[in-house]
């Protein structure tokens, strides 16, 4: 068997030289560092089922205003680190005494990560196209490591979500997804996104989600085939309970290689 579900501390191999991402070596043996899918092709590696969001430069994320100071809006980013949006990074000229008129505590906003220092000071900006305050719709949260699966290879999955639900969709890198449309359409879209999160390690998921949103019965060959990920992550570094965007994209390509890519 080239792959299987494993838990932290599980013995994977006695060949320490084959240790790959998501593993550690102890007494000459390889053990799993994570709860996820182990791949035994080539180097022994483990891809986690879940992960935490760590802010990264250029990420678009959905944040909440938690405080307003004389020169900054302080944002909760869905990570261990709050972000700072300086008044100069707002798209309009704003006097510091009027900052709360534009954004106040509790407001939800799409921002871009401008910079992250070595000390994890997170600077945000709303000067990028697409940044805006969100006054309508709903926010859905998924595990951040599942974001590439929600987007899909080449944007295939998110394109289907938008087209078949008749809703606007914005996927933040921090696992927060904004949707906007009619209530019944948002209800169905929410269920579809939950399906993607819970079945992200299955193949044929893009077809399955599309059929669900169209109200079609399952039955297309391969649409609900249950297959563990044949992950190829040699050379990709993973930390405990964390997965890189590059790794997630590789997983997505492997999972959707039998499905049509819709742009």
Swiss-Prot record:
<comment type="similarity">
    <text>Belongs to the RRP4 family.</text>
</comment>
<dbReference type="InterPro" id="IPR003029">
    <property type="entry name" value="S1_domain"/>
</dbReference>
<feature type="region of interest" description="Disordered">
    <location>
        <begin position="213"/>
        <end position="263"/>
    </location>
</feature>
<comment type="subunit">
    <text>Component of the archaeal exosome complex. Forms a trimer of Rrp4 and/or Csl4 subunits. The trimer associates with a hexameric ring-like arrangement composed of 3 Rrp41-Rrp42 heterodimers.</text>
</comment>
<keyword id="KW-0963">Cytoplasm</keyword>
<dbReference type="InterPro" id="IPR004087">
    <property type="entry name" value="KH_dom"/>
</dbReference>
<dbReference type="GO" id="GO:0000467">
    <property type="term" value="P:exonucleolytic trimming to generate mature 3'-end of 5.8S rRNA from tricistronic rRNA transcript (SSU-rRNA, 5.8S rRNA, LSU-rRNA)"/>
</dbReference>
<dbReference type="GO" id="GO:0008143">
    <property type="term" value="F:poly(A) binding"/>
</dbReference>
<dbReference type="GO" id="GO:0005737">
    <property type="term" value="C:cytoplasm"/>
</dbReference>
<dbReference type="InterPro" id="IPR012340">
    <property type="entry name" value="NA-bd_OB-fold"/>
</dbReference>
<dbReference type="InterPro" id="IPR023474">
    <property type="entry name" value="Rrp4"/>
</dbReference>
<feature type="domain" description="S1 motif">
    <location>
        <begin position="51"/>
        <end position="127"/>
    </location>
</feature>
<dbReference type="GO" id="GO:0000178">
    <property type="term" value="C:exosome (RNase complex)"/>
</dbReference>
<dbReference type="InterPro" id="IPR004088">
    <property type="entry name" value="KH_dom_type_1"/>
</dbReference>
<keyword id="KW-0271">Exosome</keyword>
<dbReference type="GO" id="GO:0034475">
    <property type="term" value="P:U4 snRNA 3'-end processing"/>
</dbReference>
<dbReference type="GO" id="GO:0071034">
    <property type="term" value="P:CUT catabolic process"/>
</dbReference>
<feature type="domain" description="KH">
    <location>
        <begin position="135"/>
        <end position="196"/>
    </location>
</feature>
<dbReference type="InterPro" id="IPR025721">
    <property type="entry name" value="Exosome_cplx_N_dom"/>
</dbReference>
<keyword id="KW-0694">RNA-binding</keyword>
<feature type="compositionally biased region" description="Acidic residues">
    <location>
        <begin position="218"/>
        <end position="245"/>
    </location>
</feature>
<dbReference type="Pfam" id="PF14382">
    <property type="entry name" value="ECR1_N"/>
</dbReference>
<dbReference type="InterPro" id="IPR026699">
    <property type="entry name" value="Exosome_RNA_bind1/RRP40/RRP4"/>
</dbReference>
<dbReference type="InterPro" id="IPR048565">
    <property type="entry name" value="RRP4_S1"/>
</dbReference>
<dbReference type="GO" id="GO:0071051">
    <property type="term" value="P:poly(A)-dependent snoRNA 3'-end processing"/>
</dbReference>
<protein>
    <recommendedName>
        <fullName>Exosome complex component Rrp4</fullName>
    </recommendedName>
</protein>
<comment type="function">
    <text>Non-catalytic component of the exosome, which is a complex involved in RNA degradation. Increases the RNA binding and the efficiency of RNA degradation. Confers strong poly(A) specificity to the exosome.</text>
</comment>
<dbReference type="Pfam" id="PF15985">
    <property type="entry name" value="KH_6"/>
</dbReference>
<dbReference type="InterPro" id="IPR036612">
    <property type="entry name" value="KH_dom_type_1_sf"/>
</dbReference>
<dbReference type="GO" id="GO:0006401">
    <property type="term" value="P:RNA catabolic process"/>
</dbReference>
